A protein has these predicted regions:
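Bacterial Sec-dependent N-terminal signal peptides
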Residues: 1-22
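Short linear Ser/Thr-Pro motifs
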Residues: 6, 15-16, 221, 569-572
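Aromatic-residue-lined binding/catalytic grooves and analogous aromatic/hydrophobic interfacial grooves
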Residues: 21-508, 526, 546, 550, ...
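Extended, hydrophobic alpha-helical segments in both membrane/secreted and soluble proteins
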Residues: 444, 513-527, 540-554
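Short loop-to-helix capping motifs
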Residues: 533-534
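Acidic/histidine-rich catalytic neighborhood
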Residues: 547, 551-601
Length: 653
């Protein structure tokens, strides 16, 4: 019955797409707006002037800030993705602006001009300082303990591209923007809707102009790895379009025509030489198409479908060669994109849409949420719903939508075969971005995956597990250098090139986070706990958990009274350097419990299990403070008026 229902829905999607405006996509689970978007952010790295891109005066540090300069993109665009490529649909009438991403397009890494040694030799040899720090704690010299930690538990790697050339840590960077001029004017436009259908993982733009109903459909297929964009109307000959592409402005490349209706852009990032390829092909019904000067010009067509795909030469590596600058290079994007595009065009729009829906629905439709199905609300634009909700009006549908939007975003940004969701999932509109749009290991990447297994999306957890595997070998060097410890760990920020060291800053409230690795490793057990995949635990998961637990044991301070505490430690982005931050103890407890249970499941490592149990039994317990609160630090300095956004110590609950 489920398969029959799925077939019916997918058939309805395909058939309704034949006639522009034939389906009300605002029904069901949908985020939608009733006013068109601005075009002001177009090619934001040049202030909306892509025509200025001449390969000179490249904005190397553009976006080196915590603020996105394109507010409409951030709050009004429609995000679609398949775990590898992503796009944001802006939905203007005069032109369609689409920001485009491929998740592995990163600056930085070992292949910059200064090579592999420059990239990897960043860990300080600081393990011998731990005894001195712990002695300072014992003697009550908090200032000395903090000073020694600040001076010795950072690295020499800046977090800002403006402060280092070549930039080692790097950043996730845009693959550019597509711009489709329509020849239409907003004057006289009516019935506008810009819709993100969570039921079908499709973005739709609909409006009427001069008694013509126009419709644009967008989806990104995971099976085909292609972005599909369909421009149609309910009258023939109404598609007059000019398609152009503004590439990443800190790369060097060239656009060539591919036949009468295709474009291929091949380039390499200036920072590290990472190669990437973008392919576009237009298929029209009626009218004419001219392919000239890097633009596709369509006149008088009934319908236009654009097929787009992209790839980089990045290769994930679980055992990187620290001497080889190209240890993360291994894919030919010319070949991969050529095959993907040829296959997609051969299938055609309807078959791709059906395949896309079947693939997506198999994940999304596993969970339904009905908070109060007897209470009905009107079909309002999402912005109006939010305004009403903030005024105190109940809206159970909005709450259901919010829940399912989280699941949708995870499906769109995390599928097997690529990197996990980053700070912005898979979506980015600039050269650089807030916090390098990296992998923040002090709660952000973990938060991305909280709904994975618990909402029946365990497959979406696999990219995170593969990402953790890429950190192990570099993380062993970090664990040994800073703590003289077995196993592996990571620090606050990671990239796709195995970066596990702390950064340059001496602000230890955020830059000192050795529990990042064990916290990541707890997700390994979570995946097993939900799936009960014993083969996975035996062949992949257990060693990751075991080595992380061993790091946690070696990192702890075994005090003369027999107890274990975390010194030095911090509560992420908040408060002083401590000798027993609750967050750290909570993660240690969790990873030790995971290791104990995993070893019992497999019937292995009785000796290590005994050690883990002994440490767990003697770990300093949680403390209750003067307000009846769970203390965040080893001393009772919590302030009930403190509204800091990080409350990581609550992990213990």
């Amino acid at each position: 019955m489920k398969k029959l229902y799925s077939f019916f829905i997918s058939t309805l999607l395909v058939s309704s797409a034949v006639c522009a405006g034939g389906t009300d996509y605002t029904k069901g689970l949908a985020i939608w707006f009733d006013a068109p978007n601005t075009l002001q952010g177009h090619a934001v790295w040049y202030g909306g002037r892509p025509d200025m891109w001449k390969g000179e005066n490249k904005p190397e540090t553009a976006g080196d800030t915590a603020r996105n300069p394109d507010a409409a993109w951030e709050s009004q665009s429609l995000p679609i993705g398949n775990g590898s490529i992503g796009a944001n649909i802006m939905g203007s009438v005069e032109a369609e602006r689409i920001t485009f991403n491929e998740k592995t397009l990163w600056r930085g890494g070992p292949n910059t001009a200064k090579g592999a040694d420059y990239y990897w030799n960043v860990n300080k040899q600081s393990a011998h300082i731990l005894d001195e720090i712990r002695k300072a704690f014992t003697e009550g010299d908090q200032a000395k303990a903090e000073r020694l930690t600040r001076q010795n538990f950072n690295s020499e790697v800046p977090y800002e591209g403006s402060r280092e050339k070549p930039f080692r840590f790097g950043s996730f960077t845009t693959m550019g923007e597509f711009y489709v001029e329509t020849g239409l004017n907003i004057i006289g436009m009516s019935d506008y809707k810009r819709i993100l259908s969570l039921d079908s993982a499709m973005a739709v733009v609909q409006f009427k102009k001069d008694d013509v109903a126009y419709q644009r459909n967008y989806f990104i297929s995971y099976p085909a790895n292609v972005l599909v964009m369909r421009f149609s109307a309910d009258r023939p000959g109404k598609q007059n379009l000019i398609f152009s592409y503004a590439p990443n402005p800190v790369s060097t490349g060239s656009m060539v025509a591919q036949g009468d209706n295709g474009l291929v852009y091949s380039a390499a990032l200036d920072n590290n030489g990472m190669k990437y390829v973008v392919r576009i092909q237009a298929e029209t019904k009626g009218g004419t198409l001219v392919n000239r000067n890097g633009k596709l010009t369509v006149k008088g067509a009934d319908e236009v479908v654009f097929y787009v795909t992209a790839d980089t030469d990045y290769k994930a590596n679980f055992a990187p060669d620290f001497k080889n600058p190209k240890t993360y290079v291994g894919v030919n994007p010319v070949e991969t994109t050529g095959q993907w595009l040829a296959n997609a065009v051969a299938k055609g729009y309807s078959a791709l849409l059906n395949e896309h829906y079947q693939d997506y629905a198999a994940l999304f439709n596993r969970v339904k949420l009905n908070l109060n199905p007897t209470v009905k609300t009107g079909n309002l634009p999402t912005g109006q719903r939010l305004k009403n909700y903030r005024k105190g009006q109940p809206d159970y549908y909005l709450e259901e939508l919010y829940f399912q939007f989280g699941r949708y975003l995870l499906i769109a940004s995390s599928r097997p075969g690529n990197m996990p969701a980053n700070l912005q999932g898979i979506w980015h509109n600039n050269v650089d971005g807030p916090w390098r749009v990296d992998y923040h290991n002090n709660i952000n990447i973990q938060m991305n995956y909280w709904p994975a297994c618990s909402t029946n999306l365990e497959e979406c957890m696999l990219p995170l597990i593969d990402f953790i595997r890429t950190l192990v070998k570099p993380g062993e060097k970090t664990a040994q250098s800073y703590f003289g410890a077995r196993g592996w760990t990571a620090s606050i920020s990671a990239n796709i090139f195995g970066f596990t060291a702390p950064l340059e800053s001496q602000d230890m409230s955020w830059n000192f986070n050795p529990m990042a690795g064990p916290w990541l490793a707890t997700h390994i057990w979570e995946y097993y706990d939900y799936t009960r995949d014993l083969k996975f635990l035996k062949e992949t998961g257990y060693e990751l958990i075991k080595s992380s637990a061993n790091f946690a044991v070696d990192y702890l301070w075994h005090k003369p009274d027999g107890t274990y505490t975390a010194a030095p430690s911090t509560s992420p982005e908040h408060g002083p350097i401590d000798q027993g931050a609750t967050f750290v103890h909570a993660v240690v407890r969790e990873i030790l419990l995971d290791a104990i249970k995993a070893s019992e499941e497999l019937g292995v490592d009785k000796k290590e299990r005994k050690e883990w149990e002994q440490v767990l039994a003697n770990l300093v317990p949680y403390k209750i403070g003067r307000y009846g609160q769970l203390m965040e630090w080893s001393v009772d300095i919590d302030d009930p008026k403190d509204e800091h956004r990080h409350v990581n110590h609550m992990f213990s609950l």
